[in-house]
Curated annotation (Swiss-Prot):
Family to which the UniProt record says this protein belongs: Belongs to the UPF0434 family.
HAMAP family, sorted: UPF0434
GO cellular component: cytosol
Protein name per its UniProtKB record: UPF0434 protein HSM_0997
Domain of life: Bacteria
Amino acid sequence: MNGRLLEIVACPICQGRLKYDSENEQLICHFDHIAYPIKQGIPILLSDQAIGLSTSLTNPEQQNQ
């Protein structure tokens, strides 16, 4: 994922920053606890395509407790 693209792309629901998850090829919104898939290098930023995530996946500091 292009770092410059990550600087300008935002969650279409809350307009918050997205974090790139290279292992699962998705962009994560920590605020809404959802992920947007990346297909063939293109982020699919449609709310109906978003995948719900558990809180522990979106808050890495909780995993270390």
